[in-house]
């Protein structure tokens, strides 16, 4: 059986060997994107869309980010630009699936964290380890129960 999830896609552009480098990451509220200085490059990320895992990357989100970069850094030069689109598993209610997945026998799942997977991953890993080891914990995980979707499939 399939669990209810969708592909949440994020886009970013990297400017390699820029003529200037921000001293710290910036969240540009007006442009709705984030600028992150990295070794030898600047990453400009923004735009989220939902699409199937088979759908190709769209040009419009990348063009939007390029316009925001040009507005924020009109004098910036760089060697080259790279474009990226990645998929994150997302549930239809925005809550991750954490717990036993009865549809796959004795298995457990822990996915669908969207943009906070790296942040929530360590704690989620501990919770799943407790579950499969039958170690009790005091966390109420009912909101994350995969059965909320399995019952409707």
What are the roles of these predicted feature ranges?
Residues 1-105:
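Active-site substrate-recognition segment that forms the wall
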Residues 97, 101-153:
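C-terminal lid/capping helical subdomain adjacent to the catalytic/cofactor pocket in oxidative enzymes
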């Amino acid at each position: 059986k399939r669990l209810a999830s969708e592909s949440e896609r994020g886009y970013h552009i990297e400017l390699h060997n820029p003529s200037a480098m921000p001293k710290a990451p910036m969240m540009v509220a007006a442009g709705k994107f984030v600028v992150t200085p990295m070794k030898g490059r600047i990453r400009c990320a923004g735009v989220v869309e939902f699409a199937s895992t088979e759908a190709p990357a769209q040009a419009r989100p990348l063009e939007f980010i390029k316009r925001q970069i040009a507005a924020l850094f009109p004098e910036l030069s760089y060697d080259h630009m790279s474009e990226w689109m990645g998929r994150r598993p997302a549930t239809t209610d925005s809550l991750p699936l954490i717990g036993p997945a009865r549809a796959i026998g004795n298995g457990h799942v822990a996915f669908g964290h969207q943009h906070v997977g790296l942040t929530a991953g360590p704690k989620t890993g501990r919770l799943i380890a407790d579950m499969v080891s039958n170690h009790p914990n005091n966390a109420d995980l009912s909101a994350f129960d995969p059965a909320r979707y399995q019952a409707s499939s």
